[in-house]
Amino acid sequence: MSTPTAADRAKALERKNEGNVFVKEKHFLKAIEKYTEAIDLDSTQSIYFSNRAFAHFKVDNFQSALNDCDEAIKLDPKNIKAYHRRALSCMALLEFKKARKDLNVLLKAKPNDPAATKALLTCDRFIREERFRKAIGGAENEAKISLCQTLNLSSFDANADLANYEGPKLEFEQLYDDKNAFKGAKIKNMSQEFISKMVNDLFLKGKYLPKKYVAAIISHADTLFRQEPSMVELENNSTPDVKISVCGDTHGQFYDVLNLFRKFGKVGPKHTYLFNGDFVDRGSWSCEVALLFYCLKILHPNNFFLNRGNHESDNMNKIYGFEDECKYKYSQRIFNMFAQSFESLPLATLINNDYLVMHGGLPSDPSATLSDFKNIDRFAQPPRDGAFMELLWADPQEANGMGPSQRGLGHAFGPDITDRFLRNNKLRKIFRSHELRMGGVQFEQKGKLMTVFSAPNYCDSQGNLGGVIHVVPGHGILQAGRNDDQNLIIETFEAVEHPDIKPMAYSNGGFGL
C-alpha cells in the first residue's frame, strides 16, 4: 500500500464527501463510484471502505460489501460501523454464525443498540433451525406434506375473520383423492368482479381476506403451477393480436403493480402477462401482490404466468419481510402455504422459441441446454449450487468469461457466455430481472441480453423507473441505440404514491442499516 501524497489525500476526501451527498440523496450507484475514486487516491482510510460497503449493501452487492468491510476492519479494528455492515452482509449471504461474531463485537461496544440486538436474535433463530434440520437429517423431506395439496378447508370455519367478513364472496370446492383424503381446494367462481372488489374494497382500504379464502386461493393456484413444466413455453407468432408483456421484480409494491396494469392493460385473452419473479419481500404489500397474482392465475390460467425468483424462497422470506408480513396479516400457516406454493413456480419461460426468460441468469455449465431446464426438479428450496440456483441468482457482467458475483451467491457471466448459449440453443435474446436498472429496461451485452425491473422508486429510495417488455411479433418499435428488435416494444412507468408505510414495515429480523 503506497503512501498517498497530501494532494491525493485532499482529493480523496473531496470524493468521499461527494459520495456522502449521493448516499443522502439515495443515489447509491453514484456513491459507489465516488467512494471508489476516493479509494483509488487514498487506500489507507478505513472509512472510505466502510462507506462504500454501505452503498454496496443498499444495491444488494453483499459480497462486495463484505469485502469492503474486511478491508475497513483491517485498516481500523475499532471501526464499529464496519462490523455492523459486515454482520448484515453475512446475514444476507445466509452466513449467520459469522454474522453473530460481528454482532457480538458491536454489542460489546454498544450494548443497547436495538438493531444489533434484533439482528442477533435473528441469527440465533436461524442457527437453531439449522441445527434442528441437521439433527433430523433426511426425515424432514421424507415427511414433508404438501399443505396446499392436502388442505382441509373446514379447518378454517371457526375463525372469527370468516364470521365477520362482509366483502366479496367466493365459492369453494373441497377436493378429495381416490382414498377420500383431502386434496386441496378449488375456487368455483373466481371473476374479475371479485378481484376488483378485493382490491378496491379490501386491500386499498387496509383490510384483509379471511384466512379460509387465502388458503383456498393458494391451494388452487398451487395446483395450476404444479401442472406447468419447469420451463414454460409461450407462443404468439400465430396470434399477432395477442401481446405478451414481460415484467420484472415488483417486490410487494402493490400500488405500482396496480398502476402497471392501468398503464399497460389488464390480463385477458388478448394480453398475456409474465412476471419474472421477486414479487414478494422488501415492499410492505407483498401479501396483496401475491394474492392478486394468484387470483389472476386462477381466472386466466393461460394468460397469466409467474417465474420463480430468488426471493420466492424460505430464507429470503425470513430475512426480507414476507414471512413476518404474512404472520401479521394472516398466520404462520398461511405463510407456510405460500412458501410451498413458491416451490411449484416454474424457473424459466421460453417465448416463441426466441426469447428465454429467467429471473437471474445463465448457468455456469457450458453444455447447459433448454432441455436441461425442462428437467430440473424444482419442487424444493433452491440449492446452494447448480443450474437451479443459477437461474435464480446469476448476473451478467461486461467482461468475457465467468466471474465472481458481487452478491456472493451465483456468479457473473460475460457476453461470450451469453452469445454461446444463444447460438447453441438457437435463441435471439435473454430476458432477465434480479437487478435494479434506473431506466426500467436495459439492453446489455451487445443487445443479446435485457434486464427488466418493474419496481419503480425501489424501496421508496432509488428513484428508478419501472420497465416492461412487450413481445409483439412484427409490430415492435425500434429505437436507435436501444431497441434493435422488430418484435419488441419497451415501455416504462413511474412510481405512484402509496400510504406512508415504509418497506419491510412488518419485519422482525433487524435487517437494515
From Swiss-Prot:
User: What is the protein's major site of localization?
Assistant: nucleus
Annotated effect of mutating H311A = Loss of phosphatase activity
> What turns on this gene?
Expression peaks in early log phase and decreases dramatically during the stationary phase (at protein level).
**Ranges of the TPR repeats in the UniProt entry:** 12-45, 46-79, 80-113
Activity regulation description: Stimulated by arachidonic acid and other unsaturated fatty acids, and by arachidoyl coenzyme A.
The residues listed in the UniProt record as binding Mn(2+) 2, with positions renumbered to this chain, are D278, N310, H359, H434
Question: Is this entry keyworded Repeat?
Answer: yes
| Transmembrane region(s) | none
**What EC number(s) are associated with this protein in UniProt?**
3.1.3.16
Ordered alphabetically, the record's keywords are: Hydrolase, Manganese, Metal-binding, Nucleus, Protein phosphatase, Repeat, TPR repeat
> Where is it located?
Nucleus
Please give the coiled-coil regions recorded for this protein: none
Task: Please give the cofactor(s) recorded in the UniProt entry for this protein.
Answer: Mg(2+); Mn(2+)
Q: Extract the ranges annotated as region (Catalytic).
A: 188-513
What is its quaternary makeup? Interacts (via TPR repeats) with HSP82 (via C-terminal MEEVD pentapeptide).
A further note on this protein reads: Present with 6990 molecules/cell in log phase SD medium.
Record protein name field: Serine/threonine-protein phosphatase T
**Organism whose genome encodes this protein:** Saccharomyces cerevisiae (strain ATCC 204508 / S288c)
Organism ancestry: Eukaryota, Fungi, Dikarya, Ascomycota, Saccharomycotina
